[in-house]
């Protein structure tokens, strides 16, 4: 069994981005990511701090806009509009979840696609579905693909199962795997017999937010397992969606939690931001 070490790979990517940023600075461009946080959700605050720290580590300027819980939808839209027209800002990220009175889809669509470094804008989704690399790809699925590539895992002809059908992970992940030549099944909360799909899979990607959802009796020998889940137990321990101790015994490759997909997600956010800054140079 080989651990897919996202932490080590993300550190390598950050070093490469440092060099790219030094080159851009020599051309008068400083990569810049604007992060908007609405409200005081503790988890969201932690995520925003980690993103700002990661930016600093590889020479990306970060602007954090922390708005109060009562910020109106129009006020948020006005801020995004200002950032859309600011040539010194290359990426705009709105930290989710948003308060109930703000329409998430409207907000995400208001970010200009050329600065949508999360890859959620309909234009970028369209590029992905057409198999084009013109836009930005969603960070978590992109991170998974980079991790698989780094370990020289050939996806062509593989039977892949994705558990979870969100627009953030499951759906774009399915498209990327299809584009790479895999045969893809997407399972979700209404799938009748999950094991029916997972037992025949060469590759399983779990992104459901459910502790121990994937157990060893549900997988075949030699399976490749990617655990996107992040769950905090009452003890404070962070675990994924996979019964790691048991499933790892049957796996050829598996990601740990933490230290697998999480660091790659942030690395891809940074990579997309630098890509946007480079686009400005071109």
Curated annotation (Swiss-Prot):
CDD domains: NAD_bind_m-THF_DH_Cyclohyd
Annotated EC: 1.5.1.5, 3.5.4.9
Keyword Aminoacyl-tRNA synthetase: no
Pfam family membership, one: THF_DHG_CYH_C
GO terms, molecular function: methenyltetrahydrofolate cyclohydrolase activity; methylenetetrahydrofolate dehydrogenase (NADP+) activity
NCBIfam families: PRK10792.1, PRK14166.1, PRK14186.1, PRK14191.1
The protein, known as: Bifunctional protein FolD
Source organism (scientific name): Campylobacter jejuni (strain RM1221)
Gene: folD
